[in-house]
From Swiss-Prot:
Protein name: 25S rRNA (cytosine-C(5))-methyltransferase NSUN5
UniProt-annotated catalytic positions: C444
Encoding gene, per UniProt annotation: NSUN5
Region annotation Disordered: where it falls in the sequence: 1-88
Coiled-coil segments: none
Reported phenotype of the disruption mutant: Reduced methylation of the C(5) position of cytosine 2268 (m5C2268) in 25S rRNA.
Presence of the UniProt keyword Nuclease in the record: no
Natural source organism: Arabidopsis thaliana
GO MF annotations, alphabetized: mRNA binding; RNA methyltransferase activity
Amino acid sequence: MVARRNKPKAPLVKHRFSGGDSHKPKPPPATKQPFSGVESHKPKTSPATKQKFSGVESHKPKTPPGKQRFSGAESRKPKTPPATKQKFSSLERSALYARREAANILRTVLRGDAERRAVASIKSLVLSPSVRNKRGTFALVCETLKYLTVIKDVLDIANVLNSKWKRQEPLVFIVCYDILFGKDTPSIGDAEKFLMRHKEALLSGLATLLVRKKVDSVDQLLGSKLTGHLKPRYVRVNTLKMDVDSAVQELEKHYTVQKDETVPDLLVLPPGSDLHAHRLVANGRIFLQGKASSMVAAALQPQAGWEVLDACSAPGNKTIHLAALMEGQGKIIACELNEERVKRLEHTIKLSGASNIEVCHGDFLGLNPKDPSFAKIRAILLDPSCSGSGTITDRLDHLLPSHSEDNNMNYDSMRLHKLAVFQKKALAHALSFPKVERVVYSTCSIYQIENEDVVSSVLPLASSLGFKLATPFPQWQRRGLPVFAGSEHLLRMDPVEDKEGFFIALFVRANKLDNPKSSELPDRVCRRRPKERTMQLHPYLCPKMFRAWSGTLHRLKTRFLLSRNGC
């Protein structure tokens, strides 16, 4: 056993001691290896040691691989062309950006439509400051939605999408529209190149679809979606920057212009007039705003120097109209909850040049009417979220997948009920501000549940607070549905006759107009105890405690009225 141990130890010890003695001379054999060049193992280690330690000699063999790498990169230029990128024209780049921007908007619209969730209209999304090519983006979104069912059927027949592009369906829909129905053939972009490789399969799928549907053209597949909706182009003059006559003179150089009979600062142009890129629109001298939207602020009739609250203000067209009607004087508090819509609101205010608007990023229902900062509010404009059923064509909602001939304007009853509950709360909250004299409630809906029913449910509370219904625009012929006494004061617009559906109700505090006697007020107000009698019944209450006690009773009474009316 000793012999066995000694035999392997001896060579190991020899190697260890020889290796230990060679700690100092180890570098010389490493340097001698490239010079000797005798043993086959030494030249294998020498290049590695040369590359690591010999700075000058190692760079010489390294440079050829480096050059080969750069030459390899040069050889890839025809495959991923940096040189061809420089040859892209500005039109190609603009089309590429427009397709991406259109895909983002299409994704938002389709997601909201699938979830039956209210989102901004296509026009509002396109007019966002982040969208550069507004005209091209708007056209792509509208045309893709028009042909969307056909595009989906063609993609199902062709079966060319993999998992990667199925996750980017909005962009695929946009590019497929350009390939199948567009004027320009897309040439740059990953999605464009992928679908162009399958162009023949897509065209073959379209031909197969026509045969299956037994039609001769794509127009027969689309049906009613091709029917146009001729509506005049309305333009509101921003009187903070320009007077109406000057705007008429400028626009008459290229268009036929008429002044609207209802709203003084509103102009009427022929249908199809495209003013998105007009100089007056770009510098905020005129705004593309519909007639119904312009009538809302005009119905409120705010006076110069007033403090006005715009409860749901984004995107801001009605807000800046209020500022123009007030001649830039007084103060407007623009309240908006959504952060993205606040940005749009601020951009609109900046473009208009209005300096008397203060943006409040928060929930209107969360505002305290007794807060000293709202003590001087004399007018409130309330245009809350609604179904938008009166502006389906204007919003282009008729292009969405959920819209059909059989289900035209047929909204979910549960969603309508939720909207109506919110609208009642918002209107009751607006009427509770102590110094407010005028309140306008408006919707772009045609449904009674959002219009007359909301007003009638809040009317007892409004009467107890001294409000009555007034008649905005007495010359207007179309009035509210005759479902309660006083509905003739309400204003309606018909989506067929007036090209858009709208509803306006105006509340005016009665004691600010004629100071009625106590016997003329509702019985609920007459039964209120006078303050002197209460102080006699409770002599131990100091005035401060009495005010707190009476305020509590007032809040309880308001809650009782709201609960009784289903708010």
